[in-house]
């Protein structure tokens, strides 16, 4: 019975598959790595005021755009299927550093 429920959920996962050339909108996965679940997101300006980006020197090339995700962990397809989805903010981040402690270039997405 559980196997058949998992098979029924596959079309929903196909809707969340990456779309070639598409942006990071609702129902789309990350092109730069796994979708992240972040306990907090903030603007780059706020993160700089709080000194959160000082340790990233040399890691991020170019200007930082988007949001900064804090205390993030990757979301797996299995986690979504079993109901262990994100209860905070789901984001797609360009640069994941310090094992998800600080992620930069994040864009909120819906699963």
Swiss-Prot record:
Induction: Expression is regulated by the mating-type genes in the secondary mycelium, and especially activated by both the MATA- and MATB-controlled pathways. Disulfide bonds join 30-37, 38-72, 86-92, 93-106. It is found in: Secreted; Secreted, Cell wall. Belongs to the fungal hydrophobin family. Residues 1-25 form the signal peptide. The keyword Signal applies. It comes from the Eukaryota. GO terms for cellular component: extracellular region; fungal-type cell wall. Disruption phenotype: Does not affect the formation of aerial structures but leads to gas channels in fruiting bodies that are easily filled with water. Its main location: secreted. InterPro entries: Hydrophobin, Hydrophobin_CS. This is Class I hydrophobin SC4. GO terms for molecular function: structural constituent of cell wall. Coiled coil: none annotated. Glycans are attached at residue 39.
């Amino acid at each position: 019975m559980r196997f058949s429920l998992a098979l029924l959920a596959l079309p929903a996962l196909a809707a969340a598959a990456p779309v070639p050339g598409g942006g990071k909108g609702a129902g789309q996965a990350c092109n730069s790595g796994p979708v992240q679940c972040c306990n907090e997101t903030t603007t780059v300006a706020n993160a700089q005021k709080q000194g959160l980006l000082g340790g990233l020197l040399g890691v991020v090339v170019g200007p930082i755009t988007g949001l900064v995700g804090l205390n993030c962990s990757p979301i797996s397809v299995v986690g979504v299927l079993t109901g262990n989805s994100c209860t905070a903010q789901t984001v797609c981040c360009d640069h994941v550093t310090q094992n998800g402690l600080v992620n930069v270039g994040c864009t909120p997405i819906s699963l």
